[in-house]
Amino acid sequence: MFRIVNGEDYSPAVQQRNILDFGKAPSLLWTDNGSSNDRCDTGGNCRESGQDRVKRPMNAFIVWSRDQRRKVALENPQMQNSEISKRLGYDWKMLTEAEKQPFFEEAQRLRAMHRDKYPGYKYRPRRKAKEATEIASRRLFSTVQPNAHRGDLVPLHIQGHTFTNGKPVKPLTAHEHKQLTPATGASQQSDKPAPQ
């Protein structure tokens, strides 16, 4: 049932051990050499090797959860990572401020080290492709103005296509267009229901 590829065992136990071993070496998280190869070793995205991307310093929760994640995973080898994360979030909330204080201090120390090492650092979150598409779509359709009489969106015409609420629709007939035009049809025909 377990796969062995190129002589390596991919059983759940081995995968769990590999995950746990990764967190044991703090040198993997913070390296002195900021080369692209180090970013691949630290869990960064190797596809970004051409860019000089600097990771954010760890916050107090991340500092605390590194060791806790390892402990929870050892106690519950079958527990999924998402479930471990939920449990860690709950456990962190249950800690008192006094219990959290050493981790806040460590996070502050790491921030200071990070600031010294990267003085011009500014956090620039990476946008996912889907988010960029949604933002472009919102900008495109932000020019659509509400119709004063009906409260609906006025159709937006772009190169022979009509869009309403960001979705293409069939072109209006002359009669439909006349009914939707505020100056002529909608105000004069108030006794008739508007077409839906």
From Swiss-Prot:
Chief place where the protein resides: nucleus
GO molecular function, one term: RNA polymerase II cis-regulatory region sequence-specific DNA binding
Protein's GO biological process: cell differentiation; male sex determination; sex differentiation
Region Disordered: start-end pairs: 33-52, 164-196
Compartments where located: Nucleus speckle; Cytoplasm; Nucleus
DNA-binding region: 54-122
The keyword DNA-binding belongs to this UniProt entry's keyword annotation: yes
Residue ranges, compositional bias (Polar residues): 181-196
Keywords of this entry: Activator, Calmodulin-binding, Cytoplasm, Differentiation, DNA-binding, Nucleus, Sexual differentiation, Transcription, Transcription regulation
Biological function: Transcriptional regulator that controls a genetic switch in male development. It is necessary and sufficient for initiating male sex determination by directing the development of supporting cell precursors (pre-Sertoli cells) as Sertoli rather than granulosa cells. Involved in different aspects of gene regulation including promoter activation or repression. Binds to the DNA consensus sequence 5'-[AT]AACAA[AT]-3'. SRY HMG box recognizes DNA by partial intercalation in the minor groove and promotes DNA bending. Also involved in pre-mRNA splicing.
Self-association state and partner proteins as the record states: Interacts with CALM, EP300, HDAC3, KPNB1, ZNF208 isoform KRAB-O, PARP1, SLC9A3R2 and WT1. The interaction with EP300 modulates its DNA-binding activity. The interaction with KPNB1 is sensitive to dissociation by Ran in the GTP-bound form. Interaction with PARP1 impaired its DNA-binding activity.
Protein name: Sex-determining region Y protein
Gene: SRY
